Amino acid sequence: VKVTVEDKALQFLNDVFAAMKMDVVMDIAYDEVEKHLDIDLKGDEMGILIGKRGQTLDSLQYLVSLVVNKDSEDYIRVKVDTEDYRKRRKETLENLAKNIAYKVKRSRRPVALEPMNPYERRIIHSALQNDKYVTTHSEGEEPYRHVVVTLKKNGER
């Protein structure tokens, strides 16, 4: 009997939610061609699963990724989401990026953001990559790596 990617993820998450005494409905979709596993969680206490700035959700996603990729020949990308958290967080970060860029232009001083995971740092970099006046770069070591927004020097692209 071949255990599917969905089965592995479902089994693992069922065990986690049982241990947490949480009632969670899972919607799982696996794209065989793209090697992408999408898991959407629904339930009453999703705030607990999201955690502070999505850290719990990110950890859960990382663990599911370890489980489904353990004996897999191809790398499977895993996304775990609930209540459109990922989309809302992306919008929040894009707005933050624009506000910080404005602050940097006004004050003419660099601004360092709070530490973020690679995915969130990439959102900030992307949001400001076409800005004429500011540039972004990451500094520090994980898990304290963060984005710094700086005023471009004259002629810098």
Segments from the language model and where they lie:
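RNA-contacting regions in translation and RNA-metabolism proteins
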Residues: V1-R157
